Every structure is written in structure tokens, then in C-alpha cells.
């Protein structure tokens, strides 16, 4: 899928600067359908390509659901704008647990979200700040 080794941790790096965001405090994966609908409504005018908008929604959902399932609580998700990209940033309380793509797992068991996001993103990474882990991905919007 990517040029990275299958067991590679996402790169440790800060995201590029971006403008103010749509932000959500998340507590349960059951909230995600409503958040996806809000995200779609609020970003439709930012992208002229419906496929790019679909990729944004998919990447956001994968990142947010990973944080809710594995992040130890206190999940915040945001979508910010750069001149030509969407910046998705998701934080959780699992600061010592870097994002790791699933290795050696049957694809039917899931766990391919990080691979998918890395393929769609022009850049991606993670960093720790204030005791929280921040995972981010930059996706084109034009």
C-alpha cells in the first residue's frame, strides 16, 4: 500500500499551520454518524471535488474511531484549512501509544485505516503535547 515498512509507526512530526477549525469533543463511536453529517455540511463549499470530500469524511471517521477505541478517553477531533488542504487533527489520552498500522492481520478483521489514511494524505504524522497524543493527516481539497 505505502512505501513504508508495514510495521512502521507513523512519523513523529508537527502538522503545518492551518486556519481555525471545526472541532468536536467525542465520547463514543455512536456520535460519529452525526459528526460526519455536520462535517459534510460544513465543508461542501470548500471542495469542488466530491471524491475529495468523501476521502476527508473517510479519513476523519477512521482517525476519530481509532482514538475512541484505543485512545483512553478525552478525544477531540478537528478539521482545519490550509490554502489547498484539509488538516484533520485528532487527540486522545494515549500519549505513549504511537499510531501503528496493523501488521499480519487478515484484512477482513479490519485494522487497515492507518494504511488507507496514509495513502490518501499528502502528509501525516503525530506528536505529543501536554500529555495528549495528536494524530494528524493533510488531505487535498482541490
Label for each model-derived stretch:
Residues 28, 33-37, 90:
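Conserved long hydrophobic alpha-helices within structured protein cores
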Residues 26-29, 50:
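Charge-dense, low-complexity intrinsically disordered segments
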Residues 59, 64-69:
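Short, well-structured hydrophobic secondary-structure segments
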Residues 33-61:
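Conserved short strand/loop->alpha-helix "switch" segment adjacent to the catalytic nucleotide/phosphoryl-transfer site
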Residues 1-27, 68-142:
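Conserved beta-strand-loop-beta-strand hairpin that lines the nucleotide-binding pocket
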